[in-house]
Structure formats: structure tokens, C-alpha cells
């Protein structure tokens, strides 16, 4: 696209070596930035119309900051010299950074090419990039959005490499945020009480274990966080930040940090492993600004494709394309005779068999989850039973995809890498050494250093049953450590989880292990290299057992390696690459969480459900908790499909009117959902075929992009009722507003590419 220049004066400034004050301007089709002689962004401008400067006068933005972890200090640019498409930034500690700045049509590409001398620098940070936008906070992918009709502008950034992740360098644990902050997107309609201020932080609700109880703040000015790529200041102004770290040498971290301490989730210490070859040189981001209404499909999609970022597709379209959002069937009841028929009648594509047990990551089965010859016949029909492979192949004939819920990277007892012969690549929190020999029955285990071993492993829940060390190939459970020499572990159980208690010699390593949480999630966390293999294992499951969709329960366990979003990106990059090598379609997945690390790869986020998410009878987002409101706000802010979670089973009492409302609301807000389907309940419903037609009609119109923005806004109004009918004998649909069960005002809708 040919760039638009605001004025001859602006053009002259762009062509000159520098402005009168040493500043320079750079621009895209939609965005202009001004950088001063010190290397700070002092101007952010909407190129499409006259606008205010979105850069706060009192808070310029450093192009690049440096961070020294040992002394916990930032260094900011003091001088900036531009030439040949590159900035030379000088810092107080003597470091000099070379940053390339490439003006693309729709974004700026920034890349750190060199930093010499390092002088103690462990990490670099892009920004913070401060704005005076106060409306919508996109904390996951880093975006400040003003969605008002008067402004309609967004400023954001995207990481262009795996080692550049959202957040600030000062938070070395990289676990990410939890809890709520105070931020009102609309101070006129939702003013803050006098007792609250912008940016104030609160813990989530409950006991820190029951995840449903986390969501306990229904007021619109309480914003739950699922990322720290953007934040607000005390005035509600949104800033954006990404960072990259030298990971070649391990560091002691304290995780999580930067959040109010939540009961049963108190931080733990962890010695993070070395990651050879992974450094901050080459760190790169795309910085962009555009009208908010075109940001996702015109700008973000362009960045993703141009920079070779993950671009998974579903039904031939990018998974982030709002016309590609659709419900997935989520089964219960264990009977499968008619489920595929239901899916075809509704025009849906995925059958997520939630009535199957949680799938455990077990490399020992080679991806053959029902045995090497598919011996296990787990899918039940009235006249037969089928293996996963057989059922997946049957569904594939009709273009349908089979999915399962798995426990992410938790390696359960009895699996190849956990027990009875544990891998040497389990994630280690701390390494200590024996100071005395052990025979097979000794429970007096003497070690050289007790530091941090009193902590119950894993900050998420601190499950006492999972507090263990590994010596050789033996797992040993313990609780506590003596405080005085000779140091020893207390309350010891040898040969834990079926491992063999054996002789160990003085000097052997005593490795405290990182677990997941208890209950159905019980297991150990892999180190990065073993996690890479687990990622490929999930692709093996798709290849050998026929699955095409996963629901990653315990998805937050990817953070437990100590590497936050880097760990998440690395896992999914390996999984998708292996699937591509096998010639498989992109794997569709949802999970327990969503993060900057999974945003590009993840298709949907059908977490939670029921009345906690959406109450169709009361027509409210979460009648029992604030989960519906909270997750709706997070997803919308970060250009991701919202969700009703697992919801809306068809039963004997179900009505067409309910599903007209469900679908209208789903399209109004851009929602998917895990559509709960149990064959016996569906067959009890007198209106089942009419409900199937409702789902199909609305979803076909959604895929055709038939709903303009003004219609979508009306569909969000819970006080209104709707009916959508396909036009007879021609393309398009008629949308009726229903009043007391009768058709009222009507709207003609057509596919977006239609000539109408």
C-alpha cells in the first residue's frame, strides 16, 4: 500500500538526517513514531486522520532498556545515533546497542543486532512503551486499545522470536501474573470507588486450589490478568513491554513474583537450568498502530504472515479469523452412536470426547494410546466398540476431528519418564549431594546444603505428597530438612512411586524435583529437552492414533520449567513442527489457560463452563461467579475468541429459543463453546432437530461473515431476542427481532463477498 504523508513538513522531517532537536520520525501506513536524540519515543500518531499524540508528554518510552539481574538495575539510553536503518544506543554502564529499525507497510520491525560490551547485562527490554490510551488493556499480546467510535485506534507489539516474551526483565521468574488489577475501561459508566485506584492489585478468590473459586469479582472495573505484556499506571494509561534474556547460564529464581501472595500458592526458589545457545542477541519485535477495527485482520495477520510466525488454520482459515470461530461438540455419557450425525446436522467439525479419561503423556506407548495394535476399544456404540484410531478414521470420512483431554506435560507415575524408572531429564529445582553412603533401607539421608529444601515443591498448591528428591533412579519422598549440621532430610519414604530403593554412594547428586499438582494431575515436570520430546509425542499421538484436537488441562504446568512463555512457545513449536513433518493438519487445541506463549498456536479457550460462564436462562455472563465476565474481557482485549466454556446440553427441557439466544450472543461477542452433548439426553429432546437447524443456520452465516458490526452490537443486548432464517431460493439470511414470540423488525444479511 502506498503510504500517506500527513504534510510536506512531515515528509521533510522523514527525509532529513534529523530534526532540529535531533529527533527522527518513522511511519507505516497507519502509524508514525518520533524518536528523540536520546533514543526515546516521544511521539505516537494515527496516520489515518488528525489525532492527538498517544505518547504521554510526561512519560517518553525508551526504545530499548538493559537489565542487570545481579544488582537489579535498569539502564536506559543516554544517546542515540541513527544511520543506515540502525540506531546506535549508548548507555550509562558503557554498553552500546545496535538496533535495526525497518519500516514495513503496516508495522516497524525492531531487532537487537549487537550489544558490546555487555558489562553485566543479563536481559534486554523493549520499552516500556507508554501510551495515554486508557480504554482496553490487552495484557497478553501487548496492546493498548481505544475502541470508542471517536478514537478507534490501537497500539501494540508482537514478539518475533521465541526468546522474546511478554513482560519486564525485572521479573526473572517469568511465571506470569495472577489475580486482579483495578482498571475501568469506561470511567463515566463504571467509575472507580474512592477506595480503589488504577493498577491496584488483588489476589484471586478462594483457597488457591479450587480454580472455580478464583473468579470472585463481578464489578467491571476488576480486571483479571492472564499476561503482563501490558499494564496500567496509576492514571489507567496502558504501557506495553517485551523482554529477552541470556538463558545460556542458569539462574536462581523466586517464582512467582510481581503478584500479591496467594494462599497455597506461595513462591518457591528454583535453580533454572542452562539453555545452550539461547541469548537475547537477535531479539525482535513488531511495533504497530492502526485503527482498532482493522487491527486483527489487516495488521496483526500481516505481521504473522510476513514474519513467519505460527499461522495455524482450521477449515482453511486462520484460527484467529472471527468468521472461523465455531463450537466444538464435547461429549458426556459414553455412548457414541449418533454423535457424528449430530455434528453433521449442525455443521460442526470437532468431537471432543470429554467422557474419556484424561490422557497422560507417556512416550512409552509411541503415540499408540490404545496399544500397538489398537487393542483398547474405548468408544462405545450400541452394537460395537471402537479404538481411538478406528473412531477417528470413521469420523474423518465425514471431515470430522476427534479430540481428547490430556494433562499437558505432567508425567504421571507409571509412565515411561516418571516411574518405576525415572528419567534423568526431569525438571530439577535444586541439586545437592550426599555426604554419607546409603544402603537400601536407610532413611537418614545426609546432604551438603539444606538451602530451600524446606519448601514444599511447586508453588502451585504445594502438594505435600509430591515433595520428593531423586538419587540415581530412585524417587524418595520427604518432608522437612534439619537446620543444623549434619543436614539431613526428614520423614523419608524410600522407593517412592514404585521405584527401586538401592545403594547410593557419598557424593551422588540429590535432585529435588519439580512436580505438577495432586489428584488427577499428579506427576513430575520435564526439563526443557524432555519437554521437547513430549511435544513431539503429542504429534505422534495424532499420527498413530488419529486425534486432531487436544484439551490441555494443566496447561499452566508448561510454566513450571521456570521459563514462562519461552517454555510454552518452545513446546508448541516442537509439536506443530512434528505434526507438519508427518503431513498432518494443524492441531486444534484448547486448554486450562491462555498466554502470550500459546496465543499464536491456540485455536480456542473453552475453559470452565455452566453457570460460572454463562447463564442462558438469566442471560448473564456468570450467575454464580465472575468467570464469564473475566474471561470474556481477557479474550476480547487480546483479539482471541471468547467462550461459554463447556455448556448448554440439549435435554428434554431445551428450547429453540434458548439456542437462538446462545448463537446470537456467541456471534455478537465472538464466542466459541464446548457444546455438551450426551446422546441419551439429546434423544429425550422433542425439539432436537429444530435446535440442530438453529445452530447450523447461525454458524453458516457466521462463516460467511454476514454480520456487520452494528448488528453484532445489537446481538450483545441480552434484553433482545432473535431468530435467523435462511432466505429461500437465494443466498443470505433474514434476522428477525422477536417480541413476545412474534417476528418484529427484520434485517437482511448477506455473505460479505456477496454483490448485494
Which residues make up each language-model segment?
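Glycan-recognition surfaces
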Residues: 419-426, 516-533, 577-684
Amino acid at each position: 500500500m502506498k503510504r500517506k504523508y500527513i504534510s510536506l513538513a512531515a515528509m521533510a522531517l522523514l527525509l532529513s538526517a534529523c530534526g532540529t532537536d535531533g529527533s527522527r520520525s518513522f511511519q507505516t501506513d497507519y502509524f508514525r513514531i518520533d524518536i528523540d536524540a536520546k533514543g526515546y519515543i516521544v511521539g505516537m500518531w494515527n496516520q489515518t486522520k488528525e489525532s492527538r499524540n498517544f505518547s504521554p508528554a510526561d512519560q517518553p518510552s525508551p526504545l530499548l532498556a538493559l537489565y542487570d539481574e545481579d544488582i537489579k538495575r535498569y539502564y536506559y539510553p543516554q544517546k542515540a545515533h541513527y544511520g543506515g536503518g540502525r540506531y546506535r544506543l549508548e548507555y550509562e554502564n558503557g554498553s552500546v546497542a545496535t538496533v535495526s529499525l525497518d519500516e514495513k507497510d503496516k508495522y516497524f520491525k525492531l531487532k537487537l543486532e549487537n550489544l558490546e560490551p555487555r558489562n553485566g547485562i543479563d536481559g534486554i527490554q523493549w520499552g516500556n512503551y507508554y501510551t495515554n490510551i486508557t480504554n482496553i488493556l490487552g495484557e497478553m499480546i501487548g496492546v493498548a486499545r481505544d475502541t470508542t467510535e471517536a478514537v478507534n485506534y490501537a497500539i501494540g507489539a508482537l514478539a518475533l522470536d521465541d526468546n522474546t516474551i511478554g513482560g519486564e526483565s525485572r521479573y526473572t521468574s517469568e511465571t506470569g501474573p495472577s489475580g486482579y488489577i483495578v482498571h475501568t475501561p469506561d470511567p463515566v459508566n463504571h467509575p472507580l470507588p474512592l477506595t480503589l485506584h488504577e493498577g491496584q492489585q488483588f489476589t484471586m478468590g478462594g483457597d488457591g486450589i479450587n480454580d472455580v473459586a478464583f473468579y470472585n469479582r463481578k464489578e467491571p472495573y476488576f480486571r483479571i490478568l492472564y499476561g503482563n505484556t501490558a499494564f496500567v499506571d496509576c492514571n489507567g494509561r496502558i504501557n506495553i513491554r517485551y523482554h529477552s534474556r541470556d538463558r545460556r547460564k542458569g539462574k536462581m529464581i523466586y517464582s512467582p513474583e510481581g503478584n500479591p501472595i496467594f494462599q497455597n500458592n506461595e513462591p518457591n526458589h528454583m535453580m533454572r537450568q542452562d539453555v545452550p545457545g539461547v541469548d537475547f542477541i537477535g531479539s525482535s519485535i513488531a511495533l504497530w498502530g492502526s485503527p482498532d477495527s482493522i487491527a486483527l485482520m489487516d495488521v496483526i495477520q500481516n505481521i504473522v504472515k510476513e514474519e513467519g510466525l505460527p499461522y495455524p488454520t482450521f477449515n482453511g482459515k486462520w484460527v484467529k479469523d472471527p468468521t472461523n470461530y465455531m463450537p466444538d461438540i464435547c461429549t458426556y455419557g459414553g455412548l457414541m452412536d449418533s454423535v457424528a450425525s449430530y455434528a453433521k446436522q449442525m455443521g460442526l467439525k470437532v468431537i471432543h470426547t470429554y467422557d474419556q479419561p484424561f490422557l497422560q503423556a507417556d512416550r512409552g506407548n509411541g503415540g499408540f494410546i490404545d496399544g500397538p495394535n489398537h487393542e483398547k476399544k474405548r468408544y462405545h456404540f450400541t452394537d460395537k466398540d471402537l479404538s481411538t484410531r478406528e473412531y477417528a478414521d470413521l469420523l474423518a470420512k465425514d471431515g470430522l476431528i476427534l479430540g481428547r483431554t490430556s494433562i499437558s506435560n505432567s508425567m504421571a507415575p507409571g509412565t515411561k519418564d516418571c516411574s518405576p524408572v525415572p528419567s534423568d531429564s526431569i525438571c530439577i529445582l535444586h541439586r545437592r549431594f550426599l555426604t554419607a553412603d546409603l544402603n537400601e533401607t536407610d532413611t537418614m539421608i545426609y546432604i551438603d546444603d539444606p538451602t530451600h529444601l524446606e519448601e514444599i515443591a511447586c508453588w502451585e498448591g504445594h502438594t505435600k505428597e509430591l515433595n520428593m528428591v531423586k538419587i540415581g533412579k530412585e524417587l524418595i519422598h520427604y518432608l522437612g530438612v534439619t537446620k543444623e549440621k549434619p543436614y539431613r532430610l526428614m520423614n523419608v519414604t524410600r522407593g517412592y512411586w514404585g521405584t527401586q530403593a538401592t545403594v547410593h554412594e557419598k557424593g551422588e547428586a540429590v535432585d529435588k524435583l519439580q512436580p505438577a499438582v495432586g489428584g488427577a494431575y499428579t506427576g513430575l515436570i520435564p526439563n526443557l529437552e524432555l519437554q521437547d520430546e513430549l511435544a513431539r509425542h503429542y504429534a505422534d499421538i495424532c499420527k498413530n492414533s488419529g486425534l486432531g484436537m487436544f484439551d490441555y488441562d494443566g496447561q499452566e504446568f508448561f510454566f513450571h520449567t521456570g521459563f514462562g512463555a519461552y517454555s510454552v512457545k518452545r513446546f508448541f513449536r516442537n509439536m506443530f513442527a512434528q505434526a507438519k513433518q508427518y503431513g498432518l493438519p494443524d492441531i486444534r487445541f484448547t486448554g486450562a489457560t491462555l498466554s502470550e506463549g500459546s496465543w499464536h498456536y491456540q485455536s480456542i479457550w473453552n475453559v470452565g463452563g455452566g453457570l460460572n460462564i454463562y447463564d442462558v436462562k438469566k442471560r448473564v455472563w456468570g450467575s454464580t461467579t465472575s468467570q464469564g465476565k473475566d474471561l470474556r474481557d481477557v479474550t476480547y482485549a487480546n483479539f482471541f475468541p471468547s467462550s461459554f466454556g463447556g455448556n448448554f446440553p440439549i435435554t428434554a427441557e431445551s428450547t429453540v429459543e434458548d439456542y437462538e439466544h446462545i448463537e446470537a450472543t456467541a456471534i455478537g461477542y465472538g464466542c466459541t463453546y464446548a457444546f455438551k452433548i450426551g446422546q441419551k439426553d439429546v434423544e429425550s429432546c422433542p425439539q432436537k432437530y429444530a435446535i440442530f437447524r438453529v445452530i447450523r443456520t447461525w454458524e453458516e452465516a457466521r462463516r460467511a461473515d454476514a454480520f456487520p458490526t452494528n448488528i453484532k452490537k445489537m446481538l450483545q443486548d441480552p434484553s433482545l431476542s432473535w431468530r435467523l432464517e435462511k432466505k429461500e431460493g437465494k443466498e443470505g439470511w433474514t434476522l428477525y427481532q422477536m417480541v413476545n414470540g412474534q417476528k418484529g423488525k427484520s434485517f437482511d444479511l448477506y455473505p460479505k463477498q456477496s454483490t448485494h
